Amino acid sequence: MTDAAARETELKFLVDPGAAGALFDALPPGTDKAARTLVSTYFDTDDQALRRAGFSLRLREGVQTVKSLAPLEGVFGRGEWEAPAAGDAPDPDFVAGTPAGAFLGEAAPSPRFRIQVSRRVRLVERGGASIEAALDQGAVEAGAHGGGLCELELELRSGPTAALFDLARDLARIAPMTLAFASKADRGFALLDGLAPAPRAPAPAPVLTEAMSAGAAFQ
């Protein structure tokens, strides 16, 4: 049974594909992982019981993951439960052992949409913190609907949260970035509903000063 959630603290930004490479190259020196293609399949019941309860269920590269769609604490922390998976469908016992299991009843989740991205990852140290930066570029496919995706994600692996905001503030000087509150799962469900938003350009780069705190920079 999966009882405890790993809490993710992360910032996600929508970025212009044309500026994505420059943003990644502007990251502090660190350890780069080999670029790879990730294919994720998201599951739910016909009546979207998991989505309505605030969860997503994903299968990717032999790992099954339940995530809370709404933050557990504050704005940037989400709950996550994961375990190895065998085959092309999540294990019912795994799902039952997470908070999402209480909302399924006898219904069996089935594939709803698919997300494929090319991912570049760099592990960096900043202000006493270890941060994983991931650049995802790809597409969401939901039935007859689809849409492009270009995100830069900064995840705090350890250390003070302020360092995460400081790094994001520095990157915002390189190119415009729009803070993304919607998860990849949210985008997939929106496409499934035929409610995909029109492409949105990132907000203009904010005016930042050295004296400005990280919190003030994101207001």
Regions inferred by a protein language model and the residue ranges of each:
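Phosphate-end processing signature that detects enzymes handling 5′-triphosphorylated RNA
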Residues: 1-219
